[in-house]
Amino acid sequence: ENLMGIKRKKGSMQSGKKPILINHLKQIINVIDEEKIEKIKKLRNRTIILIGFGGGFRRTELISIDYEDIDFVQEGVKITLRRSKTDQFGEGLIKGLPYFTNEKYCPVTSLKNWLHLSKIKTGPIFKRFAKGSILTKHRLTDQSVVLIIKECLNIAGVENKNFSGH
């Protein structure tokens, strides 16, 4: 019991997973663009990855984003998070993402393209697909995001056992 108290007070080194680095991100996006799957699925997956990476979003934050939480501004996009693990008092928080010079890796451009192609105008922006490429009304789960990221890492040839979602 005393040791646990000391550990909590002093802290201990975490043996966490590695973060995805920019070179991995580019590999993943390049591979997604080459994939032989429906355009709408490619665009959803690349948007999840670019928004997640660009804004440092947790999986649960990504899947909680609704259309009503998005505000496109001249500089990029503001995304309101109603709840977050880091928002201890439940006040909500706004994350801003700027436009990137290179559109291919720009989370804002990808988000705009996703919303246009998916025709989402309300509710969750990251939804599940039914058989084929039919978008459902159901929000993705955080586990779905894990599977999408791991699959993309695998296809990109990046060893995925050392990575985990935020």
Give the location of each predicted region:
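Extended, non-catalytic subsegments within catalytic or DNA/protein-binding/adaptor domains
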Residues: 1-166
